Amino acid sequence: MPLIPWPASADDSSKGKDDEKDIATKAKELFALAGEIPPEYFSVAAFAAGSLSLAASYFVHKRYFRRIPNAEWVSPNHLARKRWIKGRVTSVGDNDNFRFYHTPGIGWRWPLKFRRVPTLTKELKDQTIHVRIAGVDAPENAHFGRPAQPYAQEALAYLRARILGKTVFCQLIRRDQYGRMVSHVRLAPRFLPATLFRGPNLAEDMLRKGWATTYEQHGAEYGEGGVERYKQIEQEAKDARRGIWAKGVRGETPAEYKRRYAQAADGGEPPSKARAEKEQKRGWLQRLFSWK
C-alpha cells in the first residue's frame, strides 16, 4: 500500500531552515580560512597540479600512443615486461616471420581514422618491426644457394593469406641473433573488440594446419600451454596428414634441414648432392613406403 504523502509539519520546515543557516555559516568560515593562506601556497599547488597533469599525459602518450618504428627501438623495459603491441602486417617474406607496422592508440580505423599505415616501400623503410613467430619452425625456402624444402611455397602461401595486411598482436619476448623480435603472435578477434579480446594463437594455427613443426632448439619460447600443447597440436596434424605431413611423417624437418647444411658448411660433400645420389640408389617402391 503506497504511503500517504502527508504535508510537512512546522517542525520539519524550521529544521530545514536551521540546516541552511549552518551550511552558510560553515561556508563563511572556510572562505575566511582560505583568505589566511599565503598566496605562494596557491602557486605551489597550481605548479604541482600542472606537473602531475603533464607527467600523466607523457605516460599515456608513451604507453599508448608512441609508435615503435623498428626492432632497434624496442627497449629492455619492453622485453622485461613482455609487452603486447598491435600492428598491421606489411610483408611476409618467409614462412615463420614477417614485418609489421606498429599502430598504437586510436586513429587507425574508421570512424576515428586520422592516421594511416604507409603502403610504399620507401615509406616503410626502417619503419617496421621484423617479427619471428615464437615456438614454431616452418619449411625453409630456397636461399643462399640452398634448395627449398618440400611444401615451402605452400606454407608461405598459407601464412600470407592468414596475416598479410591484417592486424595482429605481438608479445615481445626477446631479440634473436638476426635482430628479429621473437614474439607470441595473436590475430585480431573476428567479432569482439580487439581492445578487450585477442584472437587465435598464430603459432598454434600453423601447427594445426600442418605448415610448421614445434621449435625445440635453444631459446625456444612457447605460449601459455607450453611445449606439451604445441607437440600435441603437431601430433594431431600428423595423424590427420595435414600440410607437410600429407605424404607421411618421416620427411626432413626444418630443424634437420638446417642442421644438415650447417654440418656441410664445416666441410665435406654438399648435402643436396649426397642426398640426391642416395635417393637414386633406392628403388621406387622403397621410396614410396618410406613415407609411411
Curated annotation (Swiss-Prot):
Q: Which GO terms describe its molecular function?
A: endonuclease activity; metal ion binding
- Active-site residues per Swiss-Prot or TrEMBL entry: 132, 140, 180
| Start and end residues of each TNase-like domain | 83-247
Which enzyme class? hydrolase
Q: Provide an example Pfam family for this protein.
A: SNase
Q: Where in the cell is it found?
A: Mitochondrion; Membrane
Membrane-spanning regions, if any?
A: 41-58
Q: Does the keyword NAD apply?
A: no
Annotated region (Disordered), positions in chain: 256-282
Q: Where is the composition biased (Basic and acidic residues)?
A: 272-282
Kindly list the positions annotated as binding Ca(2+): 137
Q: Which GO terms describe its cellular component?
A: membrane; mitochondrion
Q: How does it sit in the membrane?
A: Single-pass membrane protein
Known Gene3D superfamilies for this protein? 2.40.50.90
Q: Does NADP show up as a keyword for this record?
A: no
In which broad location class does this protein mainly occur, judging by the first location in its UniProt entry?
mitochondrion
Keywords linked to the UniProt accession: Calcium, Endonuclease, Hydrolase, Membrane, Metal-binding, Mitochondrion, Nuclease, Transmembrane, Transmembrane helix
Might you give the EC number(s) for this enzyme?
3.1.-.-
Return the similarity comment.
Answer: Belongs to the LCL3 family.
Protein name, UniProt field:
Probable endonuclease LCL3
Organism in which the protein naturally occurs: Schizophyllum commune (strain H4-8 / FGSC 9210) (Split gill fungus)
Task: Give the gene that encodes this protein.
Answer: LCL3
